[in-house]
Amino acid sequence: MGTRISSIHGRMVLDSRGNPTVEVDCITEDGTLGRAMVPSGASTGRHEAVELRDGGGRWAGKGVDKAVANVNGPIAEALVGMDASDQGVIDAAMMALDSTPNKGEIGANAMLGVSMACLRATVGTGDIWQHISDGEASIPVPLMNILNGGAHANSNVDVQEFMVVPHGFDSYPEALRAGTEIYHSLRAVLKEAGLLGGVGDEGGFAPNLPRNEEGLRYVVEAITGAGYTPGEQVSIALDVASQEFLHDDGYHIDGKVMSGSELGQLYSSWLDDYPIVSIEDPFGEDDWDSWVEFTQREGHRVQVVGDDLYVTNPERLAHGIDIGASNAILIKLNQIGTVTETLVVIAMAKAAGYGTIISHRSGETADSIISDISVGTDAGQIKTGAPARSDRTAKYNQLLRISENCNKYADMF
């Protein structure tokens, strides 16, 4: 059998922040190599599967020797000789090696690297998106992070991501051009305002601003400056990542302390004044009441996205669906740790009528598998940073390649 695994080998490589991460090679009996690199987040939910790090002094505690050893030891011992194309069996075999509920012994970073490498080895020179598709496929609308704050930037801006959403176009290449032109337009807008400084982890600009709402104003100015119509051709999405500024006494934003209800009213005022189509993590990861209140009031006019709320976990998603906490979910492979579990959560969300957004992490690599997964699952949306820095453009460029054979651009918003 050509897809039987002959070897699995893990190694340490560097991610886009210069931190160690895991890379895995899976070689099958016919000589096919599947290689995958694992991303890492900065604003992580506490309910995520465990990213196994070494601690100690080397690599500032961020080494991955333990995770790599688990790839080359127990995982390789369990999987060599198995059929790489049996994705569900492969992933289940890895999970059976770990007795914890959150992959804390083997590490989600070890498992995910192997899971993705096996998928790549199975497909070989073929297309991953076609391999996983059930017949429906489309190029996703990109949510392009052009202004960074929060944990992704060294600035005073609380909101983590201000994204442009080029939904009003007939094709992905047109949409990508619009988003990229707006990115460059924002550079000019910020330079004119004397605010052009560094960039954040995901390639977006990271200015200091007097209020978070100023970020919305500058993004709208960039959209119009590039010659596009806000709200019709290009809209705005936010990742508030509010868990990062939630403290015991409330949400600390714009120099104020707010309750969940008050914060929700602030968002409502932004929805009134700006072409916002999506808000991610508007409340803390366990502030279920605020989520429900806001979604009931505003879910008819904005996509309310759970990231830290759900952490790509089917149990948390099931609870959110039951109580109406949101109407969309962000999907991050490393939050759950295997390809199989990721696909299950996507299917579960779609069955509930939820929007699905396939996402990168702030600590990224040149791996572009999320592009294929977003197309093959017909997710409709992808979030993969600014159209700058090769760790981000790798995903956009892969979508360009795929669009040569899949010319349906998702109809969103």
PLM region descriptions:
Residues 1-22:
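Short, Gly/Pro- and small/polar-rich lid/capping loops
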Residues 13-15, 24, 100-122, 141-158, ...:
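Conserved phosphate/anionic-ligand binding catalytic regions in large, soluble enzymes, centered on
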Residues 22-29, 36-40, 144-166, 221, ...:
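Short beta-strand elements
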Residues 28-30, 72, 76-83, 94, ...:
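Structural signal for hydrophobic packing residues in well-ordered secondary-structure cores
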Residues 39-127, 131-132, 176, 204:
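Metal- or metallocofactor-binding catalytic centers and their adjacent structured scaffolds
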Residues 137-200:
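Mobile "lid/hinge" segments at catalytic clefts and subdomain interfaces of large enzymes
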Residues 161-172, 196-212, 241-254:
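Active-site-proximal beta-alpha loop/turn segments in soluble metabolic enzymes
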Residues 213-413:
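Catalytic core of soluble alpha/beta enzymes
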